[in-house]
């Protein structure tokens, strides 16, 4: 899953 603000982080 992708999450975060401005950038994509693995959740």
Swiss-Prot record:
Tissue expression profile of the protein: Expressed by the venom duct.
Family: Belongs to the conotoxin T superfamily.
GO cellular component: extracellular region
Protein name: Conotoxin ar5b
Domain of life: Eukaryota
Protein's organism: Conus araneosus
Assigned keywords, A-Z: Disulfide bond, Secreted, Toxin
Cysteine disulfide links: 2-11, 3-8
Compartments in which it is found: Secreted
GO molecular function: toxin activity
Source organism phylogeny: Eukaryota, Metazoa, Spiralia, Lophotrochozoa, Mollusca
Main location class: secreted
UniProt domain comment: The cysteine framework is X (CC-C-C).
Keyword Cell membrane part of the UniProt annotation: no
UniProt keyword ATP-binding, yes or no: no
